[in-house]
Amino acid sequence: MRVTPLISTALVLAVSGSLFAQEWVEFASRDDRFTCNFPVQPKVTEIIYRSQHEADLPARVYSATQGQSRYSVTVVDYNQAQRILTEKAKSCPKGAETCLGAVGDEGHWKADIRGAMDYASWQLMKRDAKLTLFVWGVVDLVEGRQMQLTNADKSRTFAGIYMHENKLYIIEGTVPAGYPEPGLFQQSLGWLDENGVSIRYQTYYSNGFPPPPRARRAPAAQSPGRIDAPGAVVNPVQR
């Protein structure tokens, strides 16, 4: 007789969890070549992001809220770093190596790109928060940094920082004290190619090095959680 209430409770929890998941939006950006789940359609804000070597780079922030929880993906286009820092180096004082850079690395644009993830990590560490985790990690085999911080108001921020095709991705989910970590948000980040098609690599991807071969696409029913951008056309070779 005691089994029935337990089964009913389990069913209620399962249905509630399913309904909660269904409320989230599977978002895809062809412009910034990523996919991610948000609680609602994210707001898109264009900003300027100043890099370590002071290049003012174009960036977008995709943000959404659910109650007291906040979610965002910031995408910074480091493909512009070479042009911006090379031009900036032309006006550097004579002999100012930290500004001039070197031949082929004017304005230290190469270092700016290579150090982008660490610089972004440092910006998070400087917040009024206690760092509780800082590790190397991957999302769909694209390497990056993963962080957890406890903020001054006891809320917790779960962050991931990744670099793909010279674009920096800073993903942050902040939840009130006592709330579970935002796994539905964190684990949904994915990558798109130039045609808006979801991609995954066969082994680790490190920005700045030749990309590894891509994994063969499994049928949709076998690879849940990864979507293509609207209107994407999948090449038969990718299937």
Language-model regions, residue ranges each:
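A structural detector for beta-sheet-dominated domains
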Residues: A28-R30, P39, T45, T65, ...
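Bacterial N-terminal signal peptides that target proteins for export
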Residues: M1-A10
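Boundary at the C-terminal end of the N-terminal hydrophobic targeting segment
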Residues: L19-W24
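N-terminal targeting signals for Sec/Tat export/insertion, comprising classic cleavable signal peptides
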Residues: R30-P58
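Surface-exposed amphipathic alpha-helical segments
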Residues: R30, F34, P42-K43, S91-T98, ...
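Conserved polar/disulfide-associated segments of primarily extracytoplasmic proteins
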Residues: R50-G160, D228-R239
